[in-house]
Amino acid sequence: MRAFFLPFIQDALHKAGIETDKEIQIDKPNDKKFGDFSTNIAFLLAKEARKNPRELATQLIGLFAFPEGTVTKTEVAGPGFINFHLAPAFFMRSAQEVLTQGEKFGCTESGKGQKAIVEYVSANPTGPLTIGRGRGGVLGDCIANLLETQGYEVTREYYFNDAGRQMQILAESVRYRYLEKCGQTVEFPETHYQGDYIGEIAGTLFIEHSDELASSDELGIFKETAEAVIFSSIRRTLERIGITHDSFFNEHTLYQWNEGEASGNQKVIDALEAKDFIGRYDGATWFMTTKLGQEKDKVLIKSSGDPSYRLPDIAYHVTKFERGFDLMVNVFGADHIDEYPDVLEALKILGYDASKVKIAINQFVTTTVGGQTVKMSTRKGNADLLDDLIEDVGADATRLFFIMRSKDSHLNFDVELAKKQSKDNPVFYLQYAHARICSLVRLAEKEVGFDEAAATGASLPLLDSEPEIDLASALLDFPDVIQSCLRLLEPQKMVEYLHTVAERYHKFYQECPILKADENIRTARLELSLTVRQVLRNGFRILGISAPESM
């Protein structure tokens, strides 16, 4: 509904001689006695108008020119809020747009002609995906879906961490297990990867090569085989919850020199050095962030010669700018919180518009089974695996539970709750609302000859009871919820919203007879049910969960 009010508020401001680029906030009051919507615009602009907020609010109310039959009353409340009361028929006429636009309801073309890249999952290919990585995967996938509703050309990218010390450890781990297959006694380091999958990869190599690799210290074949097997497994796991990527960027390419051309990492060092932001001491190469007011410089190349995470991350982002992306969204775990401000600062120093880079940090996940928390450790081989979770609770529950809490909050994944077939389970609750409507429509077609294909929503203005108006009002919030999700990079807002829609539909279903109502009201209530189903479907598509027609 923000789109409805905005032009009228802007027109009133223009008439009052007030020009502003401040964002006009339009909200729903918690208490309906304060209206259906309200704005704090008088607070925001009182200083520019040289009036107190109540005085400015009163002036603006006199300048609003809402069409007849839309806003029934405007009033000043408290120290200067402007409250709007809408006509019931206006809610219902507006709800017709849901049926008219169908799956396009909530979509805009604000991102048309712009390229966006969303990087997510990007787990090291050192073992099967853990549940913690799954949360970031679903978060990133939902953000990509949200961007597509706004017309962006979206690339979903996986940053393949195939360089660095962890890959050396992986190769060594497989080689140790391979030597055991060859009959040798090996002291396996505690610091190495100990899961059964390491032994399985080693077994494959032994079957293919017998013991011919045992006499060599060369790790290449062990690294390449482990990478291929593990990454194939990662992709299969992600596909089980509907996550696929369009592009895979290999970290090792940032280390490569091509025909005398410096590597991506080296180019970053050279460019920062040209800006006098590189220091060399203690045997390492440093990003001199003390010049930016920080307490310490940050290492880019360690004394061992290995780069820190910061250097390839900076170089990787340079490639995103070079590839022409207008918006770059990165989804990371909480372990990146300290590092990423340095990456953004480096991009600014190098002359890039760092405001195009958006960061979504998701907090850690623990799983509870039977009241017991499961610990995760890939290296120790007792990781809480995403595959096992999907097998246990299903793809829909896995996805929804990962995003039903704010990304900024620690998530406790209650496996038992995710498996419940009751309203306590948020997945069941949402999908049941959709299935209930599908069942109702089938029954209406059979018993009263309802023709879904002919439904236009034209009869909706006949409805004016409180449950009906509350339901229609909630449906019209859908476009604003999409915008809120994008602004905050927070699809959890969509989960909350759809729960509200389902809750209001269940109340409407209980309090407003449908098939037993008079014909005109029956048709209107069936059409209202269709609008609810459409909004649920559109929301489910963003969240990546199915819309069952029966349960």
Swiss-Prot record:
The keyword Protein biosynthesis applies. Pfam families: Arg_tRNA_synt_N (PF03485), DALR_1 (PF05746), tRNA-synt_1d (PF00750). One of its GO terms (cellular component) is cytoplasm. SMART domains: Arg_tRNA_synt_N, DALR_1. GO terms for molecular function: arginine-tRNA ligase activity; ATP binding. It is found in: Cytoplasm. The keyword Nucleotide-binding applies. It comes from the Bacteria. Keywords: Aminoacyl-tRNA synthetase, ATP-binding, Cytoplasm, Ligase, Nucleotide-binding, Protein biosynthesis. GO terms for biological process: arginyl-tRNA aminoacylation. A motif ('HIGH' region) lies at residues 123-133. It catalyses: tRNA(Arg) + L-arginine + ATP = L-arginyl-tRNA(Arg) + AMP + diphosphate. It is an enzyme of class 6 (ligase). Its EC number is 6.1.1.19. Gene3D superfamilies: Arginyl tRNA synthetase N-terminal domain, HUPs, Isoleucyl-tRNA Synthetase, Domain 1. Belongs to the class-I aminoacyl-tRNA synthetase family. Monomer. HAMAP family: Arg_tRNA_synth. This is Arginine--tRNA ligase. It comes from Chlorobaculum parvum (strain DSM 263 / NCIMB 8327).
